[in-house]
Amino acid sequence: MNKDHTLYCSVYIRNAFFSEIGIGISANSCLLLFHTFMFIRGHRPRLTDLPIGFVALIHLVMLLLAAYITEDFFMSSGGWDDITCKLVIFLHRFFRSLSVCATCLLSVFQAIILCPQSSHLAKLKQNSPHQLSYFFIFLSIFYTSISSHILIAAIPTQNITFVNLIYITNSCSFLPLSSSMQHTFSTLLAFRNVFVIGLMGLSTCYMATLLCRHKTRSQRLQNSKLSPKATPEQRALRTILMLMSFFLLMSTFDSIISYSRTILQGNPLPFCFQILVAHSYAAVSPLLVLSNEKRITNLLISMYEKIVL
């Protein structure tokens, strides 16, 4: 293991990552509190409110774990025992897997909601919440099981003289896999990512097509080049499309950086940038949702009127 990893990671990257975590924790907390408050006040929830709130909860826990891991990466001299090392790294990977699966579920669920009655997907509308719940459980188990080798490969680095350890933090590293095992896991990881990202990409393209059709039809009805005022459903669809597009973009960057790490094994900078990219979706996604949520403005106005009156 290269002990100079933290020296090469610039202080700017460290500050950027802690800023990213701080913003992400604050934004996800606000989004989760907003949905909780709307539920307590008795507002009728949208069909996508529960998945979005669930994603916010997953991201909140994931970022808290990431903050604990990053503190050991940048500041600690290494003090985790074997159980802490395996548990923290596995839980962090587990919640990252839940984030991917829940985002995929949200994309598919929104596509089913928006599909016309003539579509084959319309048959899934009535039972979609239950069917998608089973699909989410299956996808999460499948997605997480491919990373289950972490429980064996993750080891504390205190008083260990192994060479060629894969660096994670000052306290924890991965044992190198054999060439056959590495090839097997690489194939499974590639299949997993292609399946999930492909499914998400198809549903995103489908929603974008529906949005364009609806916009064109509205312009024809109004006989004007100016598009009519966006409905709440259209704003929700645009929010989902922005989330999916940003997620696909960050996933592509993450894959590129992961590949570069295999080529530049002695250079820690790709690992530092991968930390930033891997958590950017969890930090930015609640901001995208909050910025397009008109109910927040209405809620603040109603609370202000009650206070004034």
From Swiss-Prot:
Matches recorded under SUPFAM superfamilies: Family A G protein-coupled receptor-like
GO MF annotations, alphabetized: pheromone receptor activity
Membrane topology qualifier: Multi-pass membrane protein
UniProt note: phenotype after gene disruption: Mice lacking all but one V1ra and V1rb gene (12% of the V1r repertoire) show a lack of chemosensory response to a subset of known pheromonal ligands and changes in maternal aggression as well as male reproductive behavior.
Carbohydrate attachment residues: N159
Any GO CC annotation of this UniProt entry: plasma membrane
UniProt topological domain (Cytoplasmic) ranges: 41-49, 115-134, 209-238, 290-309
Subcellular localization(s) per the UniProt record: Cell membrane
Annotated keywords: Cell membrane, Disulfide bond, G-protein coupled receptor, Glycoprotein, Membrane, Pheromone response, Receptor, Transducer, Transmembrane, Transmembrane helix
Disulfide bond positions: C85-C172
InterPro entries membership: GPCR_Rhodpsn_7TM, Vmron_rcpt_1
Chain ranges on the Extracellular side, renumbered to this chain: 1-19, 71-93, 156-187, 260-268
Pfam families (UniProt xref): V1R
Role played: Putative pheromone receptor implicated in the regulation of social and reproductive behavior.
Protein name: Vomeronasal type-1 receptor 52
Organism: Mus musculus
